[in-house]
A protein has these predicted regions:
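Conserved catalytic Lys-bearing alpha helix of Rossmann-like short-chain dehydrogenase/reductases
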Residues: 18-24, 54-65
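Substrate-positioning beta->alpha
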Residues: 20, 83-84, 103-125, 132-135
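Conserved beta-loop-beta element that borders a ligand/cofactor-binding pocket
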Residues: 40, 60-81, 87-94, 99-102
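Conserved catalytic-site region of short-chain dehydrogenase/reductase
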Residues: 42-53, 76-82
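Mid/C-terminal beta-alpha module of Rossmann-like enzyme folds, strongest
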Residues: 119-187, 197-208
C-alpha cells in the first residue's frame, strides 16, 4: 500500500487518506490476500505533523483487516519519484546559492530507494513479519542541509547554503513551489513534516 494524498488541491488530505485506507481494506478483505505491506513514515515523535499523524491513522485502519499487515516506516527516500528527493535535486541543480529556512537543520535518516524495494520484497509472505511494524533507514543520520551538500558533491556542483532563523511555513512552501517541480499543496505538507526529526528507533528487520 503506497498511496498518499498530500498533493490533493481540494478538501482535507487527511480525510481523503482515511477514506482511501477504508476502501482499500474493505476491498482486500473480499479477496484471498494473506498479507498487506504498508510503506509508511517514521512516527517516533510525540508531536506529529499532519502528514505523519495521517500515516499513523492509516496504519491503524489497515491493521483492522482480516489479513496480516506489515508496516515499513521510512524517513526520506533517496531516489527518483520520491517527493523529498525531487526537492533536493531541484534545489541543488537550480540554485548555486541558497538562503534557506531553519528546517534544513532538522535531522533525518535517509534510505536509498533500492534498499526500500529490497525490504518491500523481502517481507512478502514472510510470516515473521506478519502484524509487525519496522522502522527502516540507511546508516547515516544527517540534516537536510547536509543532504543537499552531499548531493551537490555527487553531482560535481559547488553550492553555498545559508540558513535563516525565521521563515514561515507558508513562505517556505512558496519557496519550494516556485523553485521545484512539486505542487504548492505537497510543498506545504512536506514543509510541515520537515520540522520534525525522522530517525529510526530500531531496525530489527535487517536481522531477519
Amino acid at each position: 500500500y503506497l498511496i498518499h494524498s498530500m498533493s490533493t488541491k481540494k478538501g482535507n488530505f487527511e480525510e481523503l487518506e482515511e477514506i482511501s485506507a477504508f476502501n482499500f481494506r474493505n476491498a482486500i478483505q473480499k479477496t484471498r490476500a494473506r498479507q498487506v505491506v504498508y510503506l509508511s513514515g517514521i512516527v517516533n515523535e510525540e508531536k506529529l505533523s499532519k502528514h505523519l499523524s495521517s500515516r499513523k491513522n492509516v496504519e491503524g485502519i489497515l491493521s483492522s483487516g482480516s489479513y496480516a499487515l506489515t508496516t515499513l516506516r521510512a524517513g526520506i527516500i533517496i531516489g527518483s519519484g520520491s517527493a523529498s528527493f525531487e526537492i533536493i535535486r531541484d534545489l541543488v541543480e537550480k540554485l548555486p546559492v541558497m538562503i534557506a529556512p531553519r528546517w534544513l537543520n532538522t535531522a533525518a535518516q535517509p534510505i536509498a530507494i533500492r534498499n526500500v524495494i529490497e525490504y518491500l520484497s523481502g517481507v512478502l509472505l514472510n510470516e515473521q513479519t506478519f502484524n509487525q511494524s519496522y522502522d527502516i533507514g540507511g546508516p547515516d543520520i544527517m540534516n537536510y542541509k547536509q543532504m543537499l551538500l552531499t548531493f551537490a558533491k555527487v553531482r560535481g556542483l559547488k553550492r553555498r547554503i545559508g540558513v535563516v532563523p525565521v521563515m514561515t511555513t507558508k513562505l517556505s512552501s512558496y519557496w519550494l513551489y516556485f523553485i521545484t517541480s512539486i505542487s504548492f499543496s505537497l510543498a506545504k505538507n512536506l514543509v510541515d513534516s520537515m520540522n520534525f526529526k525522522v530517525i529510526c528507533t530500531e531496525n530489527t528487520l535487517q536481522d531477519l
